[in-house]
A protein has these predicted regions:
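C-terminal binding/interaction regions
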Residues: 2-41, 46-148
Length: 148
């Protein structure tokens, strides 16, 4: 796990979408992807707690695979490939519902965890967290752990 996951300093990456766009353009130009890498954001919500537990990306192929298998399947922008959530950790999620926003440029997936949390980070008890486990102080911009 990298320092960014444990720091109490706010270090947002405002260039993420620019990087993803360049990666998509490069992949299309090279013709090297198994499927179109064009992506849209997808918010992941826990059906039981109503918490947003992750924001990730999907492309058309990953979306259709999720719908077909009723499992959380995303597109990894860092690895540029299909991401079966929980494939290595065992933290899989059943896909229960999907919603599209008004501009049809992002999705909301409502999921049920099959076992535990969604994040690759763990709290002090060793349990996987949700991805939103640090709260920002508006005045100082310092972070506080809410699931230590």
């Amino acid at each position: 796990m990298g320092q960014i996951e444990e720091t109490l300093e706010l270090t947002l990456d405002f260039t993420k979408l620019e990087k993803v766009g360049k990666q998509v353009a490069d992949t299309r130009a090279a013709g090297s992807a198994d499927c179109d890498p064009g992506v849209i954001p997808v918010a992941i919500q826990n059906v039981d707690t109503k918490e947003v537990i992750l924001v990730a990306y999907t492309n058309e192929y990953a979306m259709k695979e999720s719908f077909k298998k009723r499992k959380l399947i995303l597109w990894s922008t860092s690895r540029n490939k299909l991401w079966f959530k929980g494939e290595t950790s065992g933290e899989t999620f059943d896909l229960l519902e999907a919603y599209v926003n008004c501009e049809q440029n992002s999705l909301l997936y409502v999921v049920r965890p099959c076992r535990g949390g969604i994040c690759h980070t763990k709290n002090k008890a060793g349990a996987p967290r949700n991805c939103y486990y640090r709260k920002i102080d508006f005045d100082t911009l310092k972070l506080t752990f809410v699931d230590p």
